[in-house]
Amino acid sequence: EMQRSLVGSEMCIRDSSTSFGGAYWLWMIILFSFVLQAVSYEFQSKAGNLLGKKTYQTFLVINGVVGPLLLGGAVATFFTGSDFYINKANMTDTIMPVISHWGNGWHGLDALTNIWNVILGLAVFFLARVLGSLYFINSIADKELTDKCRRAVLNNTIFFLVFFLAFVIRTLVSDGFAVNPDTLEVYMQPYKYFINFIEMPVVLIIFLTGVVLVLFGIGKTVL
């Protein structure tokens, strides 16, 4: 039987493999951007390169923006969903054993039309800027540069927290798919992820520990 996964609305069957497939073009663009980063880093200073140093540096900037933004957006689809069909009966089809089919022609790019995917992408983007500035502070002995980086860390940390907390709060109060243990019926459960934290305190402790350690590392370096 066909079942369709739609963002926050219809019942669906999802697993990690189809979640990755649900954002196909996002993952492909992410992969391409990091390949572009590696090539640009290697060739920007080589003598006689055809594109010139500034072109490769521009590619590095593109990767620095596109990579974290889309990576966060793709991960967000694990919580917001993607538009595809699943037909598990195809697993027995030796000619075409593909169980996932797109619900539209965007092949995952439609994930960027969901504001919450973009919000987590922005959180990852600003966190990447924080980590980059922290690296400069801890690796380069230049007072003028480190002072600028400290200001950058503070500014980007504020933006990171705004977007990250917005996504976390929205996720905790959102409905999620659950299974009735008596009837095995799949239904939408209010506050699903918040309930998951309550029922699995170890996961909550790990999550909070990670957040606290990130903020501690930022504070220890900057203050």
Residue ranges and their predicted role:
Residues I29-S45:
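Central hydrophobic cores of alpha-helical transmembrane segments in multi-pass inner-membrane proteins
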Residues A47-V222:
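Long, contiguous internal "core" modules enriched in hydrophobic/ aromatic residues
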Residues M2-G8, C12-I13:
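Single conserved hydrophobic/aromatic residue that forms the stacking wall/gate
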Residues C12-D15, A47-G48:
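Extended hydrophobic/Leu-rich segments
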Residues D15-F34:
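Extracellular loop-to-transmembrane helix junctions
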